[in-house]
A protein has these predicted regions:
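Structural recognition of the beta-strand scaffold that forms the well-ordered cores
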Residues: 92-95, 112-116, 157-161, 178-181, ...
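Bacterial Sec-exported substrate-binding components of ABC uptake systems
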Residues: 19-101, 208-237, 322, 335, ...
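A short, structured surface patch at a secondary-structure boundary
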Residues: 54-55, 59-151, 158-163
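C-terminal soluble interaction/assembly domains
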Residues: 268-270, 274-359, 363-372
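Flexible, glycine-rich surface segments
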Residues: 223-306
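Positively charged n-region of N-terminal signal peptides that target proteins for export
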Residues: 1-5
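Bacterial N-terminal signal peptides
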Residues: 7-17
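Extracytoplasmic substrate-binding proteins
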Residues: 135, 146, 152-245, 269-270, ...
Length: 372
């Protein structure tokens, strides 16, 4: 595309940007119905003619990261609160993450996924086939998307994941609503799963999304409540040394909560961090060498005990290594990352099977395997 043509198209897109309202923000939620319950980062408030979606800043308590005003075909800016106005349902969209594409597919709206980033990480047949047939545009890397392709495609919205102290570069100047999906920063499993309601609103399938969430919440809480009665709770740690650093989930993290809900005592449960702790082997060994279970995620390989020891010889000193307590998930060969964000009940079920196998005698592990 020639430079003059590119500039002309950008200018045209800027003129077509969705209308923004001029109303005040203080009373934005008054008179509306709140649709969210568990999420700490997302508040959905429904009014007669629009829905306000507030995304809290995960890195700054009390600060709003983004506000979206979801409206139907017409938009009367004088009646709307401040925010990025998004016309819904979306008929086209650029989706950065396979996680979000997966739940859009579950809602029956995969035809509205018309462009993706990081196409090589998609495992869904519906997206792979549409990429091959030219029905989905490959917009390149999510870290540096192909702006010219995006301009040419002109999706109705862009769904991406925000990062701390990082903007979206040229994408923000295209006049296309950028939907910041901060669900991955939620600390609770059901809090993250509740973002399906936002996705449902964006694609015109709120009722289906609400039903999906309610079923997930019932399944998760039912199993959690049963497991809460177990007489003994094994100890567990996660991941392994990589380039000299052991990235251990913080005690206030999503994974720590799932471990607890699955009936295990996470060794770093007394830590309040919601992110990953960067530890050396000596620190982990001193505190957790006798942990009963050791869960590891890999990409592109099925781990063996020999490989684990070869990666870092001192791994073999962990008690779980010798006693059959090491389990690994090859995330490149399974759909774990696509499944669990909006279906934490599948991850909970997997961990309950590992920690308390007799409680789920019929269930067979889907993602993890014992490392031998």
């Amino acid at each position: 595309m020639k430079r003059v043509g590119l500039i002309t198209i950008v200018a045209a897109l800027l003129l077509l940007v969705a209308c923004r309202s001029q109303g005040g923000q203080d009373a934005v939620h008054e008179g509306g119905d709140t649709l969210t319950v568990q999420s700490q980062l997302l508040t959905l408030t429904r009014f007669d003619n629009y829905v306000v979606a507030d995304v809290n800043d995960p890195w700054n308590d009390g600060r709003l990261l983004s506000r979206y005003v979801l409206v139907g075909d017409s938009c009367d800016s004088a009646q709307l609160p401040d925010g990025v106005v998004v016309n819904v349902p979306l008929g086209s969209s650029l989706v950065y993450s396979s996680v979000h594409a997966g739940v859009i597919n579950e809602l029956g709206c995969v035809d509205a996924v018309t462009a993706v980033c990081d196409a090589q990480y998609y495992s869904m047949p519906s997206i792979i086939d549409r990429l091959a047939n030219g029905l989905v545009v490959d917009a390149g890397s999510s870290m540096s998307p192909d702006v010219e392709k995006i301009i040419s495609h002109n999706p109705a919205a862009i769904l991406c994941s925000p990062f701390q102290n990082a903007g979206h570069g040229a994408i923000e100047r295209l006049g296309i609503p950028v939907i910041e999906c901060a669900d991955y920063m939620e600390a609770s499993p059901l809090g993250r799963a509740e973002w399906v309601k936002f996705i449902g609103l964006l694609y015109g399938e709120y009722d289906k999304a609400d039903s999906i969430y309610n079923a997930v919440a019932v399944a998760y809480d039912s199993l959690k409540n049963i497991v809460a009665k177990v007489p003994a709770r094994p100890t567990v740690i996660s991941e392994m040394v990589t380039d000299g650093v052991w990235f251990m989930p913080g005690g206030g993290s999503y994974m720590a909560e799932v471990f607890a809900d699955a009936g295990a005592d996470y060794v770093w449960a007394d830590d309040n961090s919601t992110g990953s702790l960067q530890l050396d082997f000596a620190t982990v060994y001193d505190r957790a060498h006798d942990a009963d279970f050791w869960l590891i995620k890999t990409f592109g390989r099925d781990l063996t005990l020999a490989q684990l020891e070869s990666d870092y010889a001192l791994h073999a000193r962990m008690a779980a290594f010798a006693h059959g307590g090491v389990y690994s998930c090859n995330t490149g060969a399974t759909s774990l990352f696509e499944d669990f964000p909006f279906h934490p009940e599948v991850l909970l079920r997997e961990y309950v099977k590992i920690f308390h196998g007799n409680m789920l005698p019929v269930y067979e592990l889907k993602y993890y395997k014992p490392v031998k």
